Regions:
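Conserved N-terminal phosphate-binding loop of PLP-dependent enzymes in the Aspartate aminotransferase
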Residues: 3-476
Length: 476
């Protein structure tokens, strides 16, 4: 069988059995020939476009096929046309327990029925309870503050680092994602003909992914490749560096893991050069373990941010770390105090959801993590068997419940490696074919897939069967 054509980048558990892939498509009403499945979605989107630019409220949702989703339960989602899908997107990974997990939902209903409201003055018992849970179970967090989104948390982390160090320059990762604000809205999935060949040691030009970022500000941000300690030293030698921010695993472009000793090397360089090491665990935190991936790696950052799986889909984020740094939010000298404010910070609904989520993760001696690890391993082994059988040049990268198929002959170590070898076109085509047949992989190449506690062995088996069928047809 010939290999696929190259298209490199230059520019609470649900236990009901799942049907077979073909039965699934028939029962769900998903079209198998690719026509007419999303008529109601199109109608709703056309209405929305009259009032919302582009019809969506986040640019990441503007993907093909354009689908309006109306319901999520467990490991499944439904669209406006009645089509049902096994969900491996999980809204960019927050739904670690599954959609509408009963334990979390009950906690939210309870807090509302008990009269909780947004008070905007003083504090609440809920936020203190959540803060204690986090500080007790995450070694890197001695003190914590709450915000609404991961972007807010990374913004505040960088501001805090600049205040503490008295420096302005920061280091970010090419291909990483740390939010929408000016410090990090750059160098996402940059075409290689734009950023040029690999530089090590060295830095890449700031390539904004948004208009409206002042050029003067761009000069303070230095993108380098992941897994490259020499380039960290290079930047620190040239600029007074306030912070380095990175995901411990690059999960915006699949699953790119740190090389042996890399995170430990960042810790040593932070101590040597005096910059603040910020680990962005918005995607990795709670999904890979209560203490985050930093705990797994045995590395203690200065600051760490959490979100997504922290509240199983409810909007809340956390910024925590060393108390001596966090205390700058209440510094006795007003000229040194770092402003942190927000009307909706620690809103009782997402706060209750976060408490319930963490409680659920702690139950039964880690049954959630055992279950998703078992399913993740089954998915990886099944995919690898399919790829071998079909002779596909591809590998499977996985960490626990998160996985990605790379259509290349090795797991990438950074963006340059991925962009130069992965078959993006083939990847995206496979994802779209799977969606048409009731398996929802986010339809953008090299994006992480996520397994939840609500997925079952039957879900995994049905998914593997459908992937085998589609890859067989595509690779003939």
């Amino acid at each position: 069988m010939p290999l696929h054509n190259s298209d490199k980048v230059l520019d609470t558990q649900v236990t009901s059995p799942s049907p077979s892939p073909d039965e699934f498509c028939h029962q769900a009403g998903v079209d198998t020939d690719g026509s007419g499945a999303y008529a109601k979605s199109a109608q709703i989107l056309n209405h929305n476009r009259r009032f919302i630019p582009g019809g969506v409220v986040s640019v990441n949702r503007a993907v093909q096929p354009e689908i309006v989703f109306v319901k999520g339960q467990g490991a499944h989602i439904w669209d406006a046309d009645g089509n049902q899908y096994i969900d491996y997107h999980a809204a960019f990974a927050p739904h670690f327990l599954g959609h509408n997990d009963p334990y979390v939902t009950d906690a939210v209903i309870s807090v509302l029925q008990n009269g909780a409201s947004l008070f905007g003055s003083g504090t609440t018992e809920l936020e203190g309870h959540l803060a204690e849970l986090i500080c007790r179970h995450i070694p890197a967090v001695e003190s914590v503050q709450f915000l609404n989104t991961g972007s807010e948390a990374t913004y505040q982390a960088i501001r805090l680092a600049r205040a503490v160090t008295g420096r302005d320059h920061i280091v970010v990762m090419q291909g990483g994602y740390n939010g929408w604000h000016d410090d990090v809205s750059c160098n996402l999935m940059t075409p290689l003909d734009v950023i040029g060949p690999r530089l090590s040691p060295g830095e890449y030009p700031y390539i904004p992914i948004s208009a409206g970022i002042p050029r003067e500000h761009q000069q303070l941000v230095h993108p380098i490749n992941f897994n490259d300690l020499e380039s960290v030293e290079y930047v620190c030698q040239k600029y007074p560096t306030a912070a380095l921010i990175t995901e411990p695993i690059l999960q915006n472009i699949g699953i790119i893991k740190p090389s042996t000793g890399y995170l430990q090397g960042l810790r040593r360089l932070a101590d040597r050069w005096g910059f603040v090491l910020i680990i962005d665990e918005v995607k990795t935190g709670f999904r890979h373990g209560i203490g985050g991936y930093a705990k797994i790696a045995g590395v203690t950052p200065d600051l760490v941010v959490f979100g997504k799986a922290m509240a199983n889909g409810y909007p809340i984020a956390a910024l925590g770390g060393k108390k001596k740094l966090m205390d700058w939010f209440v510094h006795p000298d007003p000229s040194k105090r770092v402003l942190l404010a927000g009307t909706y910070n620690a809103h009782p609904v997402p706060t209750a959801a976060a408490i319930a989520t963490i409680e659920r993760l702690l139950m039964n001696d880690g049954e959630v993590y055992r279950h998703v690890e078992s399913l993740g391993r089954k998915m990886q082994e099944g995919l690898e068997k399919i790829l071998r059988t079909l002779g596909c040049e591809a590998v499977v990268a996985r960490q626990g419940s998160a996985f990605c198929i790379y259509f290349m002959d090795h797991c990438p170590r950074d963006w340059h490696d991925l962009a130069g070898h992965h078959d993006f076109g083939f990847d995206e085509e496979l994802r779209k074919k799977l969606i048409k047949r009731g398996t929802y992989f986010f339809p953008v190449a090299a994006k992480q897939c996520s397994i939840s506690f609500a997925h079952t062995i039957a879900d995994i088996e049905a998914t593997l069967e459908q992937i085998h069928k589609q890859l067989s047809a595509m690779s003939r």
